[in-house]
Amino acid sequence: MKLFLTLLSLVSLQTCISSTPPIDKKDPVWEPPLSEQKGLAKAYFAAGCFWCVEAVFESVKGVHEVYSGYAGGETKNPNYNQIGTGRTGHAEAVEVHYDPKVVSFGTLVQVFFGSHDPTTSNRQGPDRGSQYRSIAFYQNSSEREMIQDYIALLEKKEIFTNAIVTEVEPLDKFYFAEEYHQDYEKRNPNNPYVRRVSI
């Protein structure tokens, strides 16, 4: 029985990586088909496997679209295979397109902290590695202050037993992930990883 559970655990750790097809490095970089919509703002977060993070934010009223991608590292135009090595500095991240008249950036920050464990370093659920670390990206000083103030509030209220290790970083560049990662949870609801980890 112990051997079975150990094997099951090992399989689940690799599911997010192994459930996807290999990448053809000759493929052009994927860009979203959605044109920029007037009046929408963007927010960026990393909170583990982007398949599940994308699904969380897409369930929020006022969010129009969420894209999976990579951010927080140094490698230009990274692909999924490179990200999986943990040597690019990037984390799996999402770009959230939202209507600030319906949902505020502050609310998205609350959703972010409420949807993952911000006290674990380089890990979320069964996924391990720096590409799964927790990062709240900001694009201006106002967003940075909102993130920092909310972290201070969570710590003051002792919501989490352990210290929050979420990185608060300026967004340098967001790279879209390959097309097969987009809306992955929606298109693959019976994937074992999705059924076990996603909302």
Regions picked out by a protein language model, each given a short descriptive name:
Residues F4-S12:
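Sec-dependent N-terminal signal peptides
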